[in-house]
Design a protein with these regions (language model features):
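Hydrophobic transmembrane alpha-helices
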Residues: 2-73
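Hydrophobic alpha-helical transmembrane segments
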Residues: 16, 41-46, 69, 84-88, ...
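Hydrophobic cores of alpha-helical transmembrane segments in multi-pass inner/ER membrane proteins
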Residues: 17-24, 113-122, 183-197
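Short helix-perturbing small/polar motifs within transmembrane alpha-helices
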Residues: 28, 108-152
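Small-polar-interrupted transmembrane alpha-helices in polytopic inner-membrane proteins
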Residues: 48-52, 82-95
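Interfacial aromatic-anchored transmembrane helix boundaries in multi-pass membrane proteins
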Residues: 56-63, 89-119
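C-terminal transmembrane helix-loop-helix hairpin of multi-pass membrane proteins
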Residues: 134-148, 164-222
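Membrane-helix interface motif
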Residues: 152-164
Length: 222
């Protein structure tokens, strides 16, 4: 889930430390593959463009709006470090387009990056027993659960930090966000299952671990 919070809403105590941590992680993640090939850079850029397109399209769900994040597939295909770099850049571009303020770029990168970081370990543990499509769907579900929980925590903190915000607003937001969270988990998992099945048939080398424990070429993109 993505934070669409404009600048000036969150107190600096909420977004400034998150932005500092995100920048540190961005530098550290860049050193993981400092000597990446042009093909790896192009691969990460292509997945980043796909993620940006998915996150820019909003799907109305009653009083709220939802958009795909592709956090699960992104984390599985790129790994934690590369996925975090891509998510940071994507969120910065979305902020320029008005999808959330610049002050929440760090928070969004951390919220989505946490889910992406868990997606690949979950996938590699599951793919030895299940099909790539099922494994990618389950890894995506875990990523969405983690990102959604962090999203709700940030929103709850923002409401509590507002001096004029009534206490009942947190319950209202939770009652609206929880069904959307469940729908988002289901939708993202279905999309991830389709991506996993497609790649298993057409480009199995892009998956990090093939069935039987063989390493895939996607591990080189991390």
């Amino acid at each position: 889930m993505h934070l669409h919070i404009p600048d000036g809403v969150l107190p600096p105590l909420a977004w400034a430390p998150a932005l500092a941590v995100a920048l540190v992680l961005l530098v550290l993640s860049a050193r993981v593959r400092a000597g990446g090939t042009r093909l790896q850079v192009a691969y990460q850029s292509a997945l980043g463009a796909l993620t940006l397109a998915a996150m820019a399209v909003e799907i109305p769900l009653g009083p709220l709006e939802y958009h795909l994040t592709l956090v699960g597939p992104l984390g599985v295909l790129l790994g934690p470090a590369a996925a975090f770099r891509v998510l940071f850049v994507v969120n910065a571009i979305l902020a320029m387009l008005g999808h959330g303020g610049f002050t929440v770029v760090g928070l969004n990168a951390l919220v989505l990056g946490a889910g992406a970081a868990l997606a690949r370990p979950a996938y590699t543990a599951l793919v030895r027993r299940f099909s790539p499509g099922t494994s990618l769907a389950l890894g995506t579900a875990l990523a969405q659960v983690v990102s959604g929980a962090l999203w709700l925590g940030v929103v709850g903190y923002a409401l509590r930090a507002g001096a004029s915000a009534p206490a009942s607003r947190l319950g209202l937001v939770a009652s609206l966000a929880f069904p959307m969270w469940l729908i988002g988990i289901a939708v993202e998992s279905v999309v991830a299952a389709g991506i996993g099945r497609f790649l298993a048939r057409v480009r199995p080398d892009l998956l990090p671990v093939r069935r039987g424990g063989m390493a895939g070429a996607a591990e080189e993109a991390a």
